[in-house]
A protein has these predicted regions:
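Conserved hydrophobic/aromatic pocket- or pore-lining residues that grip, position, or stack substrates
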Residues: 29, 84, 113
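Surface-exposed, flexible loop/turn segments at secondary-structure boundaries
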Residues: 74, 80, 92, 110, ...
């Protein structure tokens, strides 16, 4: 099947806002990056300037301006960027590249993720096998679901905005949460089902069970209704 531009790295992300730029530039779709995050973090961490970063545990690098609360848990490999806060009881389980100016909040859990600069996951969020774009925000209690109930491989499905035709992309992955573009707002207590891709500048209503592709500049409403912003 031909490429679907709307769900490519080029369309979803501004790579100037992540240290993962050299990794992500190698691939077409963002989910192709997921199996390589851990190895990339280790290589990047070993090259970080020691006057700026402290290796607080094996393969865990924290910028000296970051604030990590005593009750937070950090497992490697992980990098925590400048001016980021990792708040009370947050759990970083490894393979987590967290950018600058982020908020990893109370009881939030991260696993195998790239978190771009200025992202907020501030209250009771689970983000696994996912990539969150620049200035994206997940409301309290919203989570990514990263494994299907039947344990089959995840597909990305939707309607291509360029052709108005349905697409179904195989990912080859059992674990795949969500890809959020730049400036995405996810409402409280929403569930982003496996294989969710949300285009830049889109909003999701609270309590939404999101599945598949949500185009850029859209609003995902109650009942799965998707409308264009300012239409």
């Amino acid at each position: 099947m031909k490429s679907v531009n709307a769900v490519t790295i080029k369309e979803l992300y501004d790579l100037s806002h992540t240290e993962a730029k050299p990794l992500m530039e190698q691939y077409t779709y963002p989910w192709e990056v997921l199996p390589h995050i851990g190895e990339f973090i280790v290589k990047l961490g070993e090259s970080l300037p020691k006057e700026e970063y402290t290796e607080v545990a094996e393969h865990v690098w924290v910028h000296k301006t970051a604030k990590v609360f005593a009750s937070a848990y950090l497992a490697g490999p992980a990098i925590i960027g400048a001016e980021t806060e990792v708040r009370q009881c947050a759990c970083v389980r490894g393979n987590a590249l967290v950018g600058k100016g982020c908020v990893i909040g109370n009881s939030t859990e991260l696993k195998n993720v790239i978190i771009f600069d200025n992202v907020q996951v501030p209250h009771y969020n689970y983000v696994g096998d996912s990539i969150l774009g620049f200035k994206s925000h997940m409301g309290a209690g919203s989570i990514t679901s990263n494994v299907k109930s039947d344990k089959t491989l995840v597909h990305v499905k939707g309607i291509d905005p360029e052709t108005n035709e349905k697409f179904d992309l195989e990912t080859g992955l059992k674990k795949f949460g969500a890809m959020l573009g730049n400036h995405v707002e996810v409402g409280c207590n929403s569930v982003l089902n496996p294989g969710t891709v949300i285009g830049s500048n889109s909003n999701v209503y609270p309590l939404s069970p999101v599945r598949g592709f949500v185009p850029a500049e859209s609003i995902y409403k109650t009942g799965g209704v998707i409308v264009k912003k300012h239409a």
